[in-house]
């Protein structure tokens, strides 16, 4: 009997290719750009699609119309804002993602942005490379402390909890959090305190945004919210770029509403060279690499492959997104 066919939108480790090949016929797209017409042609026979929630195609009605046999879209990412949930349900296509494997790694990155922004690591690296060491008074290079300060976390999911542990037990910080639902068990085990969003913004020295992108969270941090923050605050976003009004963030940095920012995500990715953020010294910029370690990316890819194969074989994948559970 002919094995089912699956399409993979970007290169994956050879070991995982071999694993998929034991159960399916497959094709891996090797180029940087995947034209829509090519994708649609590949999907004519595909029962599974392995892709990414950050760099993969939008799973919308147009795509699904070209994929009559599709059973599952497996994201190699935690986020799945590329899913049109309603359209997928209408077609009987389930969606999966890869939570759990990256929680600690992304929390580590969050703290690297907090520390880098507080101590101006990227800015002062450029300062030294430009031969400016010794040209200004030392006070001009001062940063701010992280330990014993207040961290406000917006979105107390698994990554938020790991970030809170680092803050509380590693840096002896006061930790406030805001979440859709209060989490008493987390409050008891870690010692964090729930706060309304405005209170968190007003009282925190560092603000960490780790919320999924939904209709409700689109531009949830804008001019009003930045003006509520301390002018000494540092804002860090590792969620999705569109949770923040980027124009308001740029003004906040330019006009001193806040001290600085650390960003791993942006409204438009990759960032274009005319983005004003690139001209600002008080922001640390990363290229959306929250989970980017070799071990974690391998584990995410393996989990995505297992999710896809389970759905194709008529089993319930371990990591269905909540809308398909």
Curated annotation (Swiss-Prot):
The UniProt entry, under CDD domains, shows:
GDH
Q: Which reaction does it catalyse?
A: D-gluconate + NADP(+) = 2-dehydro-D-gluconate + NADPH + H(+)
Example of a GO biological process term: D-gluconate metabolic process
Q: Which GO terms describe its cellular component?
A: cytosol
- Please state the Enzyme Commission number of this protein: 1.1.1.215
What keywords were assigned to this record?
Answer: Gluconate utilization, NADP, Oxidoreductase
Q: What is the superkingdom listed in this entry's lineage? A: Bacteria
- Supply the SUPFAM superfamilies for this chain: Formate/glycerate dehydrogenase catalytic domain-like (SSF52283), NAD(P)-binding Rossmann-fold domains (SSF51735)
Q: If you read the UniProt record, what top EC class would you report for this enzyme, in one word? A: oxidoreductase
A Pfam family (short name) is 2-Hacid_dh
Q: Which GO terms describe its molecular function?
A: gluconate 2-dehydrogenase activity; glyoxylate reductase (NADPH) activity; hydroxypyruvate reductase [NAD(P)H] activity; NAD binding
Q: Where does NAD(+) bind?
A: 158-159, 211, 238-240, 264, 288-291
The family database entries (InterPro entries) matched by this protein are listed as: D-isomer_2-hydroxyacid_DH (IPR050223), D-isomer_2_OHA_DH_cat_dom (IPR006139), D-isomer_DH_CS (IPR029753), D-isomer_DH_CS1 (IPR029752), D-isomer_DH_NAD-bd (IPR006140), NAD(P)-bd_dom_sf (IPR036291)
Location of the active site: 240, 269, 288 (proton donor)
Q: Which family does it belong to?
A: Belongs to the D-isomer specific 2-hydroxyacid dehydrogenase family.
Protein name as annotated: Probable 2-ketogluconate reductase
Name its species: Bacillus subtilis (strain 168)
């Amino acid at each position: 009997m002919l094995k089912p066919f699956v399409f993979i939108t970007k290169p994956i480790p050879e070991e995982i290719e071999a694993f998929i090949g034991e159960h399916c016929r497959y094709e891996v797209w090797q180029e940087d750009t995947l034209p829509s017409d090519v994708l649609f042609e590949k999907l004519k026979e595909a029962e599974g699609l392995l892709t990414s929630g950050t760099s993969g195609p939008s799973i919308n009605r147009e795509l699904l119309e070209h994929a009559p046999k599709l059973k599952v879209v497996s994201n190699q990412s935690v986020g799945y804002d590329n899913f049109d949930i309603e359209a997928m349900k209408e077609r009987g296509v389930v969606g999966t993602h890869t939570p759990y494997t990256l929680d600690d790694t992304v929390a580590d990155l969050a703290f690297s942005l907090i520390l880098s922004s507080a101590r101006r690591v990227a800015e002062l690296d450029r300062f030294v490379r430009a031969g400016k060491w010794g040209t200004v008074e030392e006070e001009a290079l001062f940063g701010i402390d992280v330990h014993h300060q207040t961290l406000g976390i917006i979105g107390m999911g698994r990554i938020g909890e790991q970030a809170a542990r680092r803050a509380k037990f590693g840096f002896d910080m006061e930790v406030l959090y805001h979440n859709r639902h209060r989490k008493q068990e987390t409050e008891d085990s870690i010692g964090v305190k729930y706060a309304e969003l405005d209170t968190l913004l007003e009282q925190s020295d560092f603000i960490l945004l780790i919320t999924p992108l939904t209709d409700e969270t689109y531009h949830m941090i804008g001019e009003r919210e930045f003006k509520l923050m301390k002018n000494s605050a540092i804002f860090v976003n590792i969620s999705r770029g569109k949770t923040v009004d980027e124009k308001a963030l740029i003004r906040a940095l330019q006009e001193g509403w806040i001290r600085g920012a650390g960003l791993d995500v942006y409204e438009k990715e990759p960032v274009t060279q005319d983005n004003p953020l690139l001209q600002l010294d008080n922001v640390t910029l990363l290229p959306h690499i929250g989970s980017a370690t070799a071990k974690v990316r391998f584990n995410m890819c393996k989990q995505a492959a297992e999710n896809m194969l389970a759905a194709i074989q008529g089993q319930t994948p371990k990591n269905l997104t909540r809308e398909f559970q």
